[in-house]
Amino acid sequence: MLRRSLAAVLFVLALAACGGQESSTPATQAAPTQPAPSAAVLVTTDCGAKVVTAKTPVDPGQTAMRALDRVADIETDSGGKFVTGIEGVEQNTGKKLAWLYYVNGKPADKGAAEVKLADGDVEWWDLHNWEKECASVPPDAE
């Protein structure tokens, strides 16, 4: 009987010694997943009034021209340096309509073959009168 009592006391002490202590091994947690880097291309006419190609994700690191070519059927001039048509919608020099492009809502200052898209960039192409700036930028183009 004494053995049983002693065994029971030792068992209770062992349980008490284990309780209340945090494990020294850290819990394994999955690292939060980061969204894949992405840029986007949007094509409109009349300063965003009509959507030709909805905002489409593309991989960053490629040129604006390459990204456009991947999401739309394009026609170019001058050895591929100038866009003259997108998805069958052609420029019209008689009406002073040209395809102009913007990055993050700002007019591009280089040719599309020279500008590389970064993560988060939005490339917006719009067919409008080249003598006028668009008064506003479509929400999807910023």
Where are these regions (language model features)?
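Ubiquitin-like/PB1-type beta-grasp interaction modules and other compact soluble beta-rich domains
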Residues: 2-12, 18-142
